[in-house]
């Protein structure tokens, strides 16, 4: 299906926003909410929302000021994801995915001048970056790559990989992709490669007719690239994965899911209030609203605690590699995805048939379909299975304060 065309805003290089971040985010969220139903029903890219995101210069907010960004921390980025998630799950998830890749480049580029220039350009032109980390039969195992980087004598590289999913790939200005370091390298010996649109072609392999998150347009492609070797991040992907990729992904995805859950809970609250006004008594589903509110509070508390823990150790490689943190960040994803789904189900039951109907002002259908993507975005069972052996020998806490 063709995406609705929305004219891209023209941005002067180096222009700075005239409004504060909360005002800009509120404006964008309003636009995203206005078009969320159309994006979902047509399974189309949320063009209007990203027109507004680009116009209000949100794509480079976490890039350091020295490179043209605003130097915003992960806590503020997570809050943007939360607010966009309330408005439109697909918009929030695309924004989160973009920011995850920006963080990987920003935190691991070292003194690489080519990558610094790319970040400057991203901020100046408000470029949108997609991710290519799933491949072939590997599916969600992003710590394994089939396709190798091929190095040429002229200092350039080539890469061809069959990506089972590149979310919003057709609408991106660049792709950040994993790859095997070389043809003779092990599948787990990976690098991260940054590509701009002029560096690659995408050949569509499969479409995206999914239950939810329909606007992410997460189609499959064959990616063929030719680029400078300087576009490879200097650090091994193993380090990037543990220190940035996984923490940012789990925390920003979790923020989007929490936003979806909050929006569903607000729908349930509005339904219960309206029923009270019209009938003079609580509707049968009112206790489910209380349960939705309780699980939402648990979810928000867990997520903000995990954000705080990451902010405290995000520049400490030893702490990030430790079992305690790796367990925390993995369990955060599992618990956030399941609590968000529980919250939305409680909200649906609070609204009853009005929540079940797609043509109701209290419909929870889109929220439910979007949030059900959460447990299968890197399958929870895979995460728990990977944790099973490492945590088996971990001591149980002897005190509430341990």
Residue ranges of predicted features:
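Glycine-rich flavin
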Residues: 47-55, 60-167
């Amino acid at each position: 299906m063709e995406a609705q065309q929305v004219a891209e805003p023209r941005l002067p290089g180096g222009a700075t926003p005239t409004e504060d971040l909360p005002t800009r985010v509120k404006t964008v969220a309003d636009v995203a909410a206005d078009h969320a139903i159309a994006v979902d029903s047509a399974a189309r890219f949320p063009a209007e929302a990203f027109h507004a995101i680009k116009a209000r210069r949100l794509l480079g907010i976490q890039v350091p000021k020295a490179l043209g960004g605003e130097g915003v921390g992960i806590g503020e980025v997570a809050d943007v994801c939360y607010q966009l998630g309330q408005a439109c799950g697909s918009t929030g998830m695309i924004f989160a995915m973009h920011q995850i890749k920006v963080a990987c480049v920003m935190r691991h580029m070292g003194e690489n001048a080519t990558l610094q220039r790319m970040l400057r350009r991203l901020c100046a032109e408000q470029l949108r970056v997609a991710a290519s980390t799933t491949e072939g039969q590997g599916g969600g195992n992003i710590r394994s790559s089939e396709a190798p980087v091929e190095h040429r004598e002229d200092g350039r590289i080539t890469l061809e990989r069959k990506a089972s999913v590149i979310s919003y790939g057709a609408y991106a200005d660049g792709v950040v992709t994993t790859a095997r370091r070389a043809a003779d390298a092990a599948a787990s010996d990976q690098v991260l490669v940054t590509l701009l649109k002029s560096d690659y072609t995408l050949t569509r392999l499969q479409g995206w007719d999914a239950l939810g998150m329909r606007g992410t347009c997460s189609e499959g492609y064959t990616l063929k690239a030719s680029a400078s070797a300087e576009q490879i991040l200097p650090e091994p992907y193993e380090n990037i994965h543990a220190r940035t990729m996984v923490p940012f992904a789990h925390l920003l995805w979790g923020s989007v899911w929490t936003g979806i859950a909050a929006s569903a809970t607000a729908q349930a609250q509005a339904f219960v209030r309206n029923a009270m006004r019209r009938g003079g008594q609580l509707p049968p589903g009112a206790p489910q609203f209380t349960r939705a509110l309780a699980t939402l509070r648990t979810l928000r508390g867990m997520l903000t605690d995990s954000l705080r823990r990451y902010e405290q150790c995000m520049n400490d490689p030893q702490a990030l590699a430790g079992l305690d943190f790796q367990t925390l960040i993995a369990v955060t994803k599992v618990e956030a995805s399941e609590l968000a789904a529980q919250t939305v189900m409680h909200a649906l039951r609070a609204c009853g048939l009005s929540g079940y109907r797609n043509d109701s002002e209290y419909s929870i259908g889109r929220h439910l379909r979007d949030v059900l993507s959460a447990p299968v975005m890197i399958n929870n069972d895979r995460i728990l299975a990977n944790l099973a052996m490492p945590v088996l020998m971990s001591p149980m806490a002897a005190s509430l304060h341990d």
